[in-house]
């Protein structure tokens, strides 16, 4: 049976224990390699959905930020892959968001861009690096489109130095600038099970949850 690519929306049950979170990327890579071997297509496209947002009151979602980060890392681990970010459409009390149309449209962007070579931005902002200089952290992004912006024109939310306490951040051209007293080890974004992080690109596609090292 010929197929053009693979779409995957899975992971809720894997995101409940840290051991399963940590092994998810490697297991996903093995799964994709197996599919590619069976179809004799070493670059068979693989596009997947990053978990949305969930509250921890009615669901065991404490590790969802770490799991979303492991999914982001899969973009480097698995060739010819793409990730649909959906942290902005989750429900606090429902592990399965009902807005599947938006999920499908975001997956379709990856297929249109990478498989069918359409001139379309496939993703929301993905971090490419963070640097510290003279009391400021500067974060660069891919897939910013015509520029970064705040969803709904509100105050920019979602950044922290420890994954817990939110800190102010501002958009400067296609970068995020954060004033700090000293260089931190990491910078976090959207590091909550149910996140209100609101950075998007010019296509109104949301930025991924991330934890990246701050270089100097």
Residue ranges and their predicted role:
Residues 1-216:
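Cell-envelope and extracellular/periplasmic
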